[in-house]
Amino acid sequence: MPNNSNPISNQPLAESLKVVNVAVAVIHYQQQYLLGYRKREQHQGDRYEFVGGKIDINETPVAALIREVKEETGFNIAGNVILKLGRLHHDYGDKQVALHIYKIELSAEQYQHYKQQEYGLEAQMLTWADKDLLLNNHYPLPAANRTILAWLKLPKCMAITYPLAHFETPDSGDSLATNPAQRWLKYHQQQLSYQGWSYLRLKLAQSNNNTDKEAEIITQLLAIRSDISAIVPYRLRKAIDFNHLDDLKNDNISASTNQPTLNQDNLPISAYHLTQTELMAWFSQYQKQSSHLDSGADSNDDLSYDSSSNRATAEVSCRFDLDLLNTSDQNTTGLIISCHDAESIAAANQLANLRLTLSLAPVIAIFLSPVLATQTHPEQTPLGWQQWSALAALADVPVIALGGLSPAMSDLATINGANTVAGIRSFQEGV
């Protein structure tokens, strides 16, 4: 059955003179992804693209998706689970384009039926692209599709490390009994899945000393387990010493192994994590700056203007706390943001849109929690799947379900709008 529980996906889009709404279908079977090919005479021609097309006035995005895929390729996806990945907003001056992106996994029977089809019903070439080649830019895509590739790197399941406090009481016979940090390292070195995604956090009280301590412990784990795709607290991004990490990594490999020097581009850090508190602190500052612009900024104010640019460009060029929009900062790594309510999701959407406008690394996803009751936060009232799904529909980026879940609940989570499920205990399988 199609995933029609998404309240936004099932609402017809109102007519707009400026906004062109487009439904985009990321169709795949396991690691094979369907791409069309834009003809040379088309805008951004001679490039591959995900199939889809314009959403008609008063048509729902999901209905448009099913119709466009059928008209372009002949594929019938009406019975498949249709997962919202996100929405991308582009301003071209004379018009605005909103891409509504959905992910659809074909059954084995559908794939066998469709895989030999070399051309669509509009005579466009069709190609099945291997995911690894697709993510490594083997297939040139329009610039607007680059964020989609970052989203596709997300796994089905994601591990979260235990807080350091969990290791303050040693197990019987533990030789590292006096050092919780070493026990934390030993446990996660052994238990984090090989080449898996892992959110590395120790949950220490924030202080300068603890920032350095947390960065040092995480650096040691990254040196030992450089295979993982790590998510690291955003506040540690300047505390991690790349040279020290490189030295530690070399200490853990044979002298004959040729390892590149580590830097921002080849670190095993796939994303930085923002807490909801950090997000809302940024958003409050953003709103103050926006109000300042609305009231008429003085030319001597500390704002970066281009006199030929419109207000939106001036808006996103302001300097904010956390440097989240600073084009000269190290913003080449994407973000994952924790959200717990509609207000924080709206703030995350705003940040995602501004970073897209500035061509910064995208907001890859949000953590939305808690879905169910948890042992770690028994005081928090769980959302339940119905409320969780309604909130997930508001997000312009993929949503990671968190709170009381296990990997076995992945399919249920997908039906409710989750791209990924995450947790602590049951998500750490060992190497």
Regions found by a protein language model. Give the residues of each.
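Conserved Nudix-box catalytic region and its N-terminal flanking loop in Nudix hydrolases
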Residues: 29-72, 229-231
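Nudix hydrolase/Nudix homology domain
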Residues: 43, 47, 119-199
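Glycine-rich phosphate-binding active-site loops on the catalytic face of alpha/beta enzymes
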Residues: 277-280, 367-378, 412-431
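Catalytic cores of alpha/beta
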Residues: 238-248, 263-264, 342-354, 405-420
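Active-site-adjacent beta-strand/loop module that shapes the phosphate/pyrophosphate-binding cleft
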Residues: 87-117, 131
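Alpha-helix-loop-beta-strand connector modules within alpha/beta enzyme cores
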Residues: 218-229, 383-400
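Glycine-rich adenosine-cofactor-binding loop
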Residues: 341, 384-387, 397-409, 413, ...
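Conserved N-terminal beta-strand and adjoining loop/helix that marks the start
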Residues: 2-34, 87, 102-105
